[in-house]
Amino acid sequence: TTRLDEIKSLGTTVLWLMPIYEQGVENAVSSPYCVKDYKKLNAGYGTLDDVKTLVARAHEKGMRVIFDWVANHTSWDNAWMQNKTWYTQDANGNIISPEGMGWADVADLNYDNVDMRAAMLEAMKYWIEVVDIDGYRCDYAEGVPHDFWQQAINELKTIKGDELLMLAEGSETTLFADGFDLVY
């Protein structure tokens, strides 16, 4: 928070924080995109109160804050692993990594599972409700079904209204129809 004035002086209107969630260690390659717990901070980034203070001070200075969101996969030691059907499985029933991506450090989520979808949406709501962030930059948005994004964005707007800012990493222009403000 000590450098927010300097950041603001650069013309910054939005702070985008890369994944700051607790990282997994099983099969890990030190990637912040290997999320162990969507509702816990990586201890190296401070406390929940630290993040709340950062967001509040950024808002006071007229800046919005978005978090990077990793909705396609989790770490192999995420507590969700207790629910095997929340993950994509091969023909033998083994949980798999996202196909064709070379990401062996993460497990692919199964968006056909309504309970997993509900848990994902609950985790997204958490940061908006508890920390008052302004939205998300969604990693590999094309790897998540369009109907999930439509539902999630609509529900998040019930909390944030039109102030919600949603960015999609991808190139499919259909992501705009899902409610994303920017696709890149």
Listing of model-derived features with the role each one plays in the protein:
Residues 1, 34-48, 102-117, 134-143:
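The substrate-binding groove and active-site-proximal loops of carbohydrate-active enzymes
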Residues 1-64, 72:
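N-terminal structural segment of carbohydrate-active enzymes
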Residues 4-10, 51-65, 69-70, 79-88, ...:
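An active-site-proximal structural segment forming one wall of the substrate-binding cleft
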Residues 21-24, 71-76, 142-143, 171-174:
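Solvent-exposed loop/turn segments at secondary-structure junctions
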Residues 26-37, 71-99, 180-184:
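Aromatic- and acidic-residue-enriched segments that line the glycan-binding/catalytic groove
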Residues 55, 59, 122-123, 129, ...:
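Active-site-proximal helices and loops of the catalytic beta/alpha 8
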Residues 86-118, 140-157:
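Active-site cleft segment of glycoside hydrolase catalytic domains centered on the general acid/base Glu
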